A protein has these predicted regions:
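N-terminal targeting signals for export/organelle localization
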Residues: 1-47, 167, 185-191
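Thiol-/selenol-based redox modules, centered on thioredoxin-like
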Residues: 147-191
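Short, internal strand/loop/helix patches
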Residues: 113-151
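A short beta-strand-turn-helix
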Residues: 44-65, 88-91
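Conserved hydrophobic packing residues within short motifs/helices of P-loop NTPase cores
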Residues: 65-67, 99-101, 146
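Thiol-based oxidoreductase modules, predominantly thioredoxin-like and allied folds used
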Residues: 95-109, 121-131
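Conserved redox-active cysteine motifs that mediate thiol-disulfide chemistry
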Residues: 69-86
């Protein structure tokens, strides 16, 4: 083999290795680019159980979104729902959208609707029985929640039930929505 042929062979090997690396990066991109605070929120598609139409995160572009991944069998999920509903009622007039995505795969959509109705939930309930949202957001537990700002960036991530009416939670939504904290009557708050 001549020197020229050796260099051509080396060039081919380098190109094959570079191509393999490029393909590997694209195939395993989820593992290389974790979803977390400061990252762009991945788009997803799930069925809205009220309208029965598919919804995507892109439908809420430019909006503040609390994305909650939950299941009907999850007791911590159920425990946090009342505070999430209270947060929604306080901040929905200011533009907050709550997307609660049920990942139940062995429960009917009617059962999920009844569950939400029994809890008095008025925010959007979506359903993803394929668990695609879990893969996209790399969730590790239930409930798992993501606060997404108007630019589509994840600002906070919670794994486990949260008190959505805690001062820290409300301060975050006040900041993102450009609102002032609600006044408590009789609490001596000064405007």
């Amino acid at each position: 083999m001549t020197v020229r042929q050796q260099w051509i062979l080396v060039g081919v090997v380098v190109l094959v290795l570079a191509g393999g690396l490029f393909a590997g990066v694209n195939i395993f991109a989820d593992d290389l680019y974790p979803v977390g605070v400061g990252s762009k929120a991945p788009n997803f598609k799930a069925k809205d159980l009220q309208s029965r139409a598919p919804k995507t995160l892109a439908d809420y572009k430019g909006q503040v979104v609390l994305l909650n991944v939950w299941a009907t069998w999850c007791e911590p999920c159920k425990a946090e729902m009342p505070s999430m509903e209270e947060l929604y009622r306080s901040y929905q007039p200011h533009g907050l959208h709550i997307l609660a995505v049920s990942i139940d795969d062995y429960v009917t959509e009617d059962s999920i609707r009844a569950y939400a109705k029994d809890l008095g939930l008025t925010f959007e309930i979506l359903h993803d029985p394929t668990h695609a949202i879990e893969k996209a957001y790399q969730t590790t537990g239930y409930p798992e929640s993501f606060v997404i700002d108007r630019d589509g960036v994840i600002r906070r991530k919670w794994i486990a039930a949260a008190d959505w009416n805690a001062p820290g939670s409300r301060a975050l939504f006040d900041e993102l929505l450009g609102t002032r904290p609600p006044m408590n009557e009789g609490a001596g708050a000064v405007p």
